[in-house]
């Protein structure tokens, strides 16, 4: 699928990157198979969906990176993603199938379209700026803020709720680690 990647070396320590990409994610084969899996012990049924469409996304990213003279960097970026036909598991209760009622029914569905916008910040630095003996010890941390909004939510029995966020898309994520080399 098409993509455009641009990098501008402002100077030796400062880089700006931008990109547009289109990506396609096909459904898992197990989700496409028109199979029926009945778990009698829990009275659950799972049915595949051969009608699933691939998820297509249009992605715009812009970032700026500053590299320290010693090992490390600070980076900030923004992103926007338009996602079409994302897939989630639709779960229903008291579902009737071939004359039996099951307490839980699960089937993958194309749930609709979503827009995602966010900010990413990251920082990595060894501690040699404190003391040269600490050149093999460092810190790495990231923070991401994401706002998502689902449009055209396609679930049976549910209305398109206002300001519904995309499933599996947390608003805040962060990671931090200390590292050392041997």
Segments and roles (model prediction):
Residues 1-14, 37:
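Signature of Gram-negative outer-membrane beta-barrel scaffolds
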Residues 15-17, 21, 25-27, 31, ...:
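Membrane-embedded beta-barrel scaffold of Gram-negative outer-membrane proteins
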Residues 6-9, 22, 66, 125-127, ...:
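Residue-level signature of outer-membrane beta-barrel architecture
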Residues 80-82, 100-182:
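Gram-negative outer-membrane beta-barrel transporters
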């Amino acid at each position: 699928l098409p993509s455009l990647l641009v990098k501008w070396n402002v100077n030796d320590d400062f880089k700006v990157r931008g990109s547009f990409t289109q990506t396609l994610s096909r459904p898992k084969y197990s989700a496409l198979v028109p199979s029926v899996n009945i778990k009698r012990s829990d009275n659950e049924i799972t049915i595949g969906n051969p009608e699933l469409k691939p998820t297509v996304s249009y992605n715009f990213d812009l970032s700026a990176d500053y590299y320290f003279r010693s090992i490390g960097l600070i980076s900030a970026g923004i992103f926007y993603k338009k996602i079409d036909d994302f897939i989630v598991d639709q779960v229903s209760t008291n579902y009737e199938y071939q004359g039996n009622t099951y307490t839980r029914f699960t089937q993958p569905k194309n749930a609709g379209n979503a827009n995602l916008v966010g900010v990413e910040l990251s920082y990595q630095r060894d501690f040699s700026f404190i003391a040269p003996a600490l050149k093999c010890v460092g810190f790495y941390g990231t923070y991401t803020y994401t706002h998502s909004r689902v449009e055209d939510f396609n679930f049976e029995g549910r209305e398109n709720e206002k300001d519904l966020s995309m499933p599996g898309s947390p608003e805040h994520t962060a990671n931090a680690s200390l590292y050392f080399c041997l």
